[in-house]
Amino acid sequence: MAQQSPYSAAMAEQRHQEWLRFVDLLKNAYQNDLHLPLLNLMLTPDEREALGTRVRIVEELLRGEMSQRELKNELGAGIATITRGSNSLKAAPVELRQWLEEVLLKSD
């Protein structure tokens, strides 16, 4: 069997299926109140910290009170990470953006 390029369509599909499998596993873990142990198992402390930072980035971008450069200084995140978050938020479905605003900005 020939080795697949890491950028092949077949490999991309396999990675997508693996991601969906993880999402299903996480959903099941939530239903069984095992989500925190699962996430602690699957993510390193650095990865968990990075996810928390990304939530803060999205929250602050939705709030719209700081520039990307100010966010970089406030959160200690790279400008590329903040720009990716901004671009992803712009491309997000309207329903997701509205839900995020409700959930993340509810105390404002």
Curated annotation (Swiss-Prot):
Cited InterPro entries: Trp_repress (IPR000831), Trp_repress_bac (IPR013335), Trp_repressor/repl_initiator (IPR010921), TrpR-like_sf (IPR038116)
Highest taxon listed in the record's lineage: Bacteria
GO molecular function, one term: sequence-specific DNA binding
A Pfam family this chain is assigned to: Trp_repressor
Locations listed in the record: Cytoplasm
GO cellular component, one term: cytoplasm
DNA-binding region(s), chain positions: 68-91
Keyword Transcription regulation attached: yes
GO biological process: negative regulation of DNA-templated transcription; regulation of DNA-templated transcription
Keywords: Cytoplasm, DNA-binding, Repressor, Transcription, Transcription regulation
Role played: This protein is an aporepressor. When complexed with L-tryptophan it binds the operator region of the trp operon (5'-ACTAGT-'3') and prevents the initiation of transcription. The complex also regulates trp repressor biosynthesis by binding to its regulatory region.
PANTHER family hit by this protein: TRP OPERON REPRESSOR (PTHR38025:SF1)
Subunit comment: Homodimer.
Family statement drawn from the similarity comment of this UniProt entry: Belongs to the TrpR family.
Protein name: Trp operon repressor
Native source organism of the sequence: Escherichia coli (strain K12)
